[in-house]
A protein has these predicted regions:
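Intrinsically disordered, low-complexity terminal regions enriched in Ser/Thr/Pro/Gly
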Residues: 30-192
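Secretory targeting signatures
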Residues: 1-30
Length: 192
């Protein structure tokens, strides 16, 4: 579904920026990581954490409007109010937890984990009349050697023509394609 001239754009990033890599790896490495020593306490704690992770409901622990920025990272953003200029891009930062991992074995026998998300992003008037957006937007896939538990989504709406001044709602439905679970976020915003 595409309405009007408003275009959704979705960016999913995990382990992409050098600054995020080292922090992420410290949480994501499993027992098969090549190191000079193994840490049985870490492995036991990680195994216990993943058992709890598997019981979590898929939902965002953070879901806020953010300023567009060249700096993207897990927990790295500059918060934006819900008041926008008519020609401003509307960007939501969401940090989900409780998503699934699908184990995949490559032809060479290498074990990887797939994380896969899609999103519906619909801008409406306050009365629910759709103005623009899209559905079933590929939000990205991540293939990793580890069951990553930290990632973020930047869900953006851009538009060709300035939005009329007024009050709106943005409805986000994010689906974890591995588990089939979805979470919904509705954000009010004002264009001045």
């Amino acid at each position: 579904m595409s309405c009007g001239s408003i275009k959704p754009a979705v960016v999913i990033l995990s382990l992409v920026l050098l600054g995020s890599v080292f922090l992420q790896v410290s949480y994501s490495q499993g027992p098969n990581v090549t190191t000079s020593t193994t840490d049985p306490k870490y492995e036991a704690a990680r195994d216990q954490f993943l058992k709890v992770w598997d019981t979590l409901t898929f939902h965002p622990i953070v879901a806020i409007f953010v300023n567009e920025s060249a700096e993207l990272g897990n927990g790295v953003y500059q918060e934006h109010s819900n008041v926008f200029n008519p020609d401003e891009t509307i960007t939501l930062y969401a940090q989900p937890v409780g998503f699934g991992h699908k184990e995949i074995t490559e032809e060479n026998g290498e074990k990887l984990f797939l994380m896969n998300f899609t999103a519906d992003i619909i801008l409406t008037k306050q009365d629910g009349t759709p103005i623009g957006g899209g559905t079933n937007i590929p939000a990205g896939q991540i293939m990793s050697h580890y069951r990553n538990t930290e990632l973020f989504l930047h869900l953006s709406l851009t538009h060709d023509n300035p939005l009329p001044k007024g009050e709106y709602k943005v409805n986000y439905n994010v689906t974890d394609q591995i588990s089939g679970n979805t979470f919904k976020i509705t954000k009010d915003l004002k264009v001045v």
